[in-house]
Amino acid sequence: MELSESEMLDLWKTMMQLQPAHYGCAIERTDGIDIDELLLIHIRKWYASLLLSAPDGIVPVEDVKDRLSVMVADNGVVTAMVPPECVRPVEWKLKAWQKSVTLFLQPNVPEAAYLHNEWTRPGVCDPAAVDYGNRILLFTLPDGELPIFDMARCVVRPTNGKYVFHASVLESLRVNRSTSQRRDDPILRNLDNSSFRVFDDLI
């Protein structure tokens, strides 16, 4: 699915059962709360979380190998600066490697520290990578080889402002409209505490 922000807002309202039942009515808010803006904040947070944590098969993934800024240190460690639309790496491979990497270590774990030691640093048979957010460190490039990438697949945030995801994630938008669920949801609490004036358009 690929939806604009307005289409996503309409879908969100439908899934949360917030669309008016009677389309012949005009609704005017009297408490000054912009419900659409509240919902958009909720939507943007939901989508950001989806991009960070969902399986790569249901969120947009692109090969960004041609958009990387790459540097190679004397010890063969490759630093690749990722483009701003990249949310997280999925699978990367240097042409000199015998296999790709799909596990990207966080810099604060002990395994990442071992990679910086020349005696425990991996080679082309069992490469490794550390994710620093805006850059990826790749271990290691053999002497005499160029840092050419076969792939650098990343989950990306669409640059056109669209919401792109597999239709299967819509189940997560379904909201139980029981009293307890509405009490726990701040968006729905705002709706319940609001004042509406409904005017029949036939009058």
Feature-to-residue mapping (PLM):
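Glycine-enriched, solvent-exposed interface loops adjoining structured elements
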Residues: 1-126, 130-203
